[in-house]
């Protein structure tokens, strides 16, 4: 596999006739597996949306060759800039009839959760769920989730049922303490909230295996999100919309009063 942004094995190495390992392209940049406050210093939310698109385009290029990443997760990504990122640990991707033997429960689609990944081939639809979880985690960078994929606040998974956060058409009926991740969520536009909610909530029309958004669908939504940040559309109603770590939840601004014309 020789694709831009993919650090996959290029050559096998042998020692005294025994397989010793593989050579792979060097991945530059910083990792996304830890606290990201310092990593994203100076970044805007528009930059974060562009990074998500960059990563999705790389995943999409693999899909076009019928290759699935399999072990989709933030720790397998290194970042140089919003326009340059690398998928690493690509020696475990699913190719032809060779399954990806590893995975993280946090990103795993409900229909394959708890199974031995080495015993079956994932579907692209299952990968689409992982992609949605990846984008959710990237747009909502925080440590409110532990390694098992559970909220420290509420102890529930992102893709638990019901989904923890309000989205258009569904309200939990009980307030969620406004932790940093919930504050970030409040500043996302409704179309993105809806896409995430309808994917992770079993009542949503994007939850079923056959109905999930693919890479192209997420790219379309993220590009629109970025454009509305850059042209000021979202900032007109929400001055903190472009902040990666807003200090407060979104405040609904009153409609602008029409100018008074004196005749």
Task: Give, region by region, the residue ranges found by the protein language model.
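Conserved structural core of kinase catalytic domains
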Residues: 4-51
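Catalytic-loop of the protein kinase fold
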Residues: 59-80
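Activation segment/activation loop of eukaryotic-type protein kinase catalytic domains
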Residues: 75-115
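Conserved end of the kinase activation segment
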Residues: 112-125
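Conserved C-lobe activation region of Hanks-type protein kinase-like domains
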Residues: 135-193
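Terminal C-lobe "cap" of eukaryotic-type protein kinase domains
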Residues: 200-231
